[in-house]
Amino acid sequence: MSEIASRVKAIIVDKLGVEESEVTTEASFTNDLGADSLDTVELIMEFEKEFGISIPDDQAEKIGTVGDAVSYIEANAK
């Protein structure tokens, strides 16, 4: 697992209060991890803060799984 993936996973565990074992690449924030729309917005904000990036709303809407988040951040992190 990459450093970015590990950091993303840690943020999700912290913010959603889920078990680390539940946070898989394929896990959907809403369907698998129980996030609501506010939780998802807060996750995006945490990713922006943690990685020093800005995620436009149109891109944030496409980030629905742990893998989506990791891929986006890996492609856009400074």
Swiss-Prot record:
Subcellular location(s): the record lists: Cytoplasm
Taking the first listed entry, what is the main subcellular location of this protein, grouped into a coarse class?
Answer: cytoplasm
Superkingdom to which the source organism belongs: Bacteria
A Pfam family: PP-binding
Any one annotated GO CC term: membrane
List keywords of the entry alphabetically: Cytoplasm, Fatty acid biosynthesis, Fatty acid metabolism, Lipid biosynthesis, Lipid metabolism, Phosphopantetheine, Phosphoprotein
Domain Carrier span(s) in chain numbering:
2-77
GO BP terms in the entry: lipid A biosynthetic process
Q: How is it modified after translation?
A: 4'-phosphopantetheine is transferred from CoA to a specific serine of apo-ACP by AcpS. This modification is essential for activity because fatty acids are bound in thioester linkage to the sulfhydryl of the prosthetic group.
- Tell me where in this chain the PTM O-(pantetheine 4'-phosphoryl)serine is found: 37
Molecular-function GO term, any one: acyl carrier activity
Q: In which pathway does it act?
A: Lipid metabolism; fatty acid biosynthesis
The family note in this entry says: Belongs to the acyl carrier protein (ACP) family.
Q: What is this protein for, i.e. what is its function? A: Carrier of the growing fatty acid chain in fatty acid biosynthesis.
Protein name, UniProt field: Acyl carrier protein
